[in-house]
Structures are given as structure tokens and as C-alpha cells.
Amino acid sequence: MGRKEVLAERRALENFYYNCKLETPQEVAKQFEVYTRLIWEFHQAGLCYDYYCDQTVTHLEGVGTWVGGKDALEVETLPTFSAYPNKKCNFKEIYAVGDAEQGYHFGQITSNSGTFSRAGATMGGLGDGSTFDEDSSYCLCECYVNKVEGRWCIVSEFVVNGQEAIRRRTANTRPFCKTILEFYKGLEKEDS
């Protein structure tokens, strides 16, 4: 795909994203598919601040539970752009239920594909140029979306990432791992 096609695709996604009203479950499903693609495929990490808030509770397989989704998400997202700049999010399914008064609940299944860039910084040095294919691991994500202080926010998120496949695939390619785990430790939700 050439530059013009990439820009046209991005513009079409942005057009939907910035004009969506979240009035039906179908719009919610489409909005969060577009949202995910804009962040991961078009490297728009700043969009994290559109739907995550200080009250977001995130439950991540292998890490635990923390509060403060927008900052944690940005810290985890930015370094991955260098490691695999051509990552694609392949949506297998996304489904939403709910309404504009009570809020929405959606679930999605994705798999990723791309290349670990030889120019990308990693814990072990530069990436090795290896590829990861669609369907090599799946990400399951479930979110609750409600109004917080007058705007739509993800208030609770549950993520299962196929961690073993990711660990094998990304051995020595996540320079931010120690830092991000220390960051999460400070955000852990206290048990009541």
C-alpha cells in the first residue's frame, strides 16, 4: 500500500472516529475498532487520553490490577512503536451491548501481525527483523464504557494477551518491561 492509500485509510478512520456519537451498540463496536487501529497501526498514542481516565481500572493478565489507565496505557504503548512499527491489529470479532443511558459493555478479539524492526531499540539491542504472523497469538479485551464527568470513558478493562506466545516472540525486545512493571506496582488497586 502506497503513501496515498495509507493516508486515505487513516483519514477515513479519523472521520468516523471524530464524528461518532456512541448512540448505539453498533457505533460503540465500530468506534473502538477504529480507536484501536488508530493507536496501534497509525501510532496515535495520544488518543489514549480520549477514552481512558484516572478512574479506569485495568486487569491485565500476568501484571495484575491497577487504577489510572491513561498514563499506564501511554507508558506501555509508546515504546512498542519503535520495536514493531508496521504492526497490524487484525480484528476477529467485536461486539457491544448497552445503551447511551446505562453505558456500554464490549468485547473484542484481535491478533497482531508485523515485523520486529532491525532499527527498533530493544533490551537486547536492535530488533532482529523477524515477523509475527496473524493468528500466532490472540488478545481478548473486555471493557465497560460509562460517562465520567460528562464524557465517555472506559471505566473497567480486562485484557488477556496470549502471554506465553508474546513472551517467546518478544524475548529481549521490550526495553520498557522492567520500568512498566515498576510503574504498575505503584498503581495497584488496594484490596478492600
Regions inferred by a protein language model and the residue ranges of each:
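Catalytic cores of transferase enzymes with a strong primary signal for eukaryotic protein kinases
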Residues: 83, 90-94, 121, 141-146, ...
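A solvent-exposed, acidic/Ser-Thr-rich amphipathic alpha-helical stretch
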Residues: 33, 45-118
